[in-house]
Amino acid sequence: ATGYNEKYLPLLTEAVSAGHQIALHSASHEYSDIYRSSDAYWEDIALLKERIAPYVDAESIRYLRFPGGSTNTVSRRYGGKGLMKQLKAEVEQKGWHWVDWNVCAEDAVGGHPSAGTIYRNVVHETGQQTNCIVLMHDSATTRTTAEALPDIIRWYADNGYTFLTVAEALPLN
C-alpha cells in the first residue's frame, strides 16, 4: 500500500534494475474503500500507478494481487457477493494476470511472530508443493519477515527450488 510507504518509492527503480518484477497491489489497502465497487477498485489502482510512475513504467505492469487475495470474503461486506468475480473478469479483460499465493508466511496475522516462526510456517506450508508463490509482508509491524528471508531463500535453494519472477512463472498469453 503505497500510501503508507511513500518514502520507499525510489527503491522501485533499484528493484527493477536488479531484475525484480513489480506488480500492482493497492494504493490504500483500505478494504472498505477499494471494495466498495469496481469503479472504486480501479480508482485505487489508477492512484497507485500514478504514485509509482516516476520510478517505474507503471503502464507496462500487467500483474496484480488483490488485497486479501482473489477469494477474499471481506469484499462482500462492502461491494457485494459478486464483486471479486467481476474484478477478476475485468483484470482478464485488460489482458492482465491476477496472482494469488499458495504459501503464507503468516507474518501479518498479529502477535509479531519471530523469524523462526515465519521460517517454520513457510517450510510447513510449502510441504510437497513444487511451484510456490509465498505471501510475505514488508511493513513496520512485520520486521521479522526480513530477518527470516535469508534462511527461507537458503531452504528453497537447498531443496532444489528455482526462483522466478511472476511473469516467468505465469506468462501472459
Place the predicted regions along the sequence by residue.
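C-terminal domain-boundary segment and adjacent tail
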Residues: 141-173
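Structural recognition of the beta-strand scaffold that forms the well-ordered cores
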Residues: 21-26, 60-66, 97-102, 132-136, ...
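Active-site beta->alpha N-cap acidic-glycine motif
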Residues: 1-66, 169-172
